[in-house]
Amino acid sequence: MKKRIAGILTAALIGTTVMGTVVMAAPSGAIDVISREDGSGTRGAFVELFGIEEEKDGEKVDMTTQEASITNNTDVMLTTVAGDENSIGYVSLGSLNDTVKAVKIDGAEATAENVADDTYKVARPFNIVTGDKLSDAAQDFINYIMSSDGQDIIEKEGYIKVDEKAEAYKAGDAKGKVVVMGSSSVGPVMEKLAEAYQKTNKNITVEVQVSDSTTGINSATEGVCDIGMASRELKDEETEKGVKATEIAKDGIAVIVNND
């Protein structure tokens, strides 16, 4: 990702000046950078993939420009970019809609097919996060997510399934409630999974609460929820607290601009 659009985007996000033609240039020539909030898995994955970070005192530091406008979830990002013809931002590929335009990266369009065959390289995992003490109800819901039934829903919603050979779901005898918390990028597909699952297994209810990846990971760690959602890899210091990540899908990150 060292071609022009990647360079322009990186420069815009860290607040430096780039000479040359911006592929999706705004009428005024200015670029309004729209970023996600600290704690967002999409932001964390994005700055890592584009190298928008520096190492300081042994730790990687996010170098997103202080001039960036911050949005706190996926829907707000889409609405903000759709309403500002000078803007550039980024969003989960599965959440991309026709209110904005996705730009090509290294000549590749942001599509699920291109993510699957590694043509489009701006991609990250969708993880669920669990602790050691998992309820039978939560385990049954996870079994559904990883079954062919769940993986087919993931693919239908525009994401990339992680198990092409998954077997069909077989309901157990668990009962109860499952609370899922975290990433606003994972949230939409998790809600679809929960809806379909509850039609199949009427003995279990699933509540999905959307926030961000870090909140989801922390909530799973502290036992506030049964399952956390994260749209990034977990850090060593997070897994050291006793939680583990399970990849349920793969998702691209689309770089987006205004349709005009």
Language-model segments: which ranges?
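Exported/periplasmic ABC-transporter solute-binding proteins
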Residues: 4-10, 24-260
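C-terminal segment of classical bacterial N-terminal signal peptides
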Residues: 16-24
